[in-house]
Amino acid sequence: MFIVKHFKDLSVDEFFEIAKARYEVFACEQKITQENDFDDTDKKCYHIFSLDNNIITSYARIIPKEYSSYEDTSIGRVLVNKNYRRNGLAKKLMMNSIEFITNNLNEEHITLSAQYYIKDLYKSLGFKEISDVYDEVGIPHVKMRL
């Protein structure tokens, strides 16, 4: 089951678990500095996540169009806890994110900056590459749009 909450509706414990999950994946695994992860945009976003015994198993933030750096609503900070990978959870997370955007934000287009090595996941959901590969925080990315 996926939970979607606007930042202002997150409990302190939920935000702590989200921060911990993002730190483990982005800082520890991918060596991304915290300045490049947390920003004021978090306060304007919806946060979607799944839990197992109060552990974040998957997470993404949904950035409404008016706050997105793209012309569309966007999805970012997509992660799956390393102990829950290789079982389709990332695809389920993205499908639920797309459904939320379509049904609650009434948006039909979504743009994201995909880490290049997982672009096929996004392609399987209908996203198309709309840029060449570029570097973002030392990791190859490609801009994609649904």
Give each language-model segment a name.
Residues 83-85, 121-124:
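Acidic/histidine-enriched, beta-strand-rich ligand/metal-binding domains
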Residues 1-37, 42-56:
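Short amphipathic alpha-helix that is part of the acyltransferase structural core
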Residues 93, 118-121:
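Conserved short alpha-helix immediately C-terminal to the canonical SAM/SAH-binding motif I
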Residues 94, 101-114:
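Conserved GNAT acetyl-CoA-binding A-motif
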Residues 49, 55-65, 72-79:
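Conserved beta-strand in the GNAT
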Residues 65-75, 85, 104-108, 138-140:
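A conserved beta-turn-beta hairpin within the catalytic core of GNAT-like acetyltransferases
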Residues 111-113, 123, 128-143:
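Conserved catalytic-core motifs of GNAT/GCN5-like acyltransferases
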Residues 80, 86-99:
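Conserved acetyl-CoA-binding loop-helix of GNAT-fold acetyltransferases
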